[in-house]
Amino acid sequence: MNKKRNAPVRKIIADNRKARFNFEILDNLEVGLVLQGAEVKSLRSNHANIAESYASFENGELWLVNSYIPEYTQANRFNHEPRRLRKLLISKREMARFFNATSREGMTLVPLKLYFNERGRAKLEIALARGKKLHDKRETEKKRDWRCEKARLLKRYG
C-alpha cells in the first residue's frame, strides 16, 4: 500500500539570522540557483554560509555574491571555487521590480535562507531590505527583551 505523504518538507541548509536584525525586510522572493554538481553534493551535506552574502544585478542578470559553499572532498579535480559568483534564476517581471526597488538609495537584496524544496531543488529566499540604523537595532532588542520578560511573568503569575 502507498503511504500518504505528509506536509512538504523544506530542508534548510543555511539561515541568515543576522539579516533580520541588521535589515528591515520589505519583500521576500524564492529564487533558484545555478549550481555545479560538486556544489549540490556539498549542500546536501549541510555545508554553506550566506551570512556575508548579498545579491546584485550585473548585465541584466541577478548574481549571488560572496556566498560560501565549501569544496566537496570527494570531487577531486572537478571541484568548484568556494566563493564564486552564482547566478540566480528569477522571472523577468520580478527582476524588473527588484531592480527598480534596489536602484533607490539604501535598498539592497539580502539572502535569508538556503534550502532544498519538496522536489529536491536548491532554492534561495532573498529579501528586499533597507539597512537599520543603530537606534532601530536597539529598539528591536528592547522589544525582544520585553517579549521574553512578559512571557516569563505570565508563566510565573498567570
UniProtKB/Swiss-Prot annotation:
InterPro entries from the UniProt entry: SmpB, SsrA-bd_prot
User: Molecular function (GO) terms listed?
Assistant: RNA binding
UniProt GO cellular component terms? cytosol
Pfam families, alphabetically?
Answer: SmpB (PF01668)
- State where the protein is found: Cytoplasm
Keywords assigned by UniProt? Cytoplasm, RNA-binding
- Its GO biological process terms? trans-translation
Superkingdom assignment: Bacteria
Hey, which family's this protein in? Answer: Belongs to the SmpB family.
Protein function: Required for rescue of stalled ribosomes mediated by trans-translation. Binds to transfer-messenger RNA (tmRNA), required for stable association of tmRNA with ribosomes. tmRNA and SmpB together mimic tRNA shape, replacing the anticodon stem-loop with SmpB. tmRNA is encoded by the ssrA gene; the 2 termini fold to resemble tRNA(Ala) and it encodes a 'tag peptide', a short internal open reading frame. During trans-translation Ala-aminoacylated tmRNA acts like a tRNA, entering the A-site of stalled ribosomes, displacing the stalled mRNA.
Which named protein is this? SsrA-binding protein
Q: What species does this protein belong to? A: Bartonella quintana (strain Toulouse)
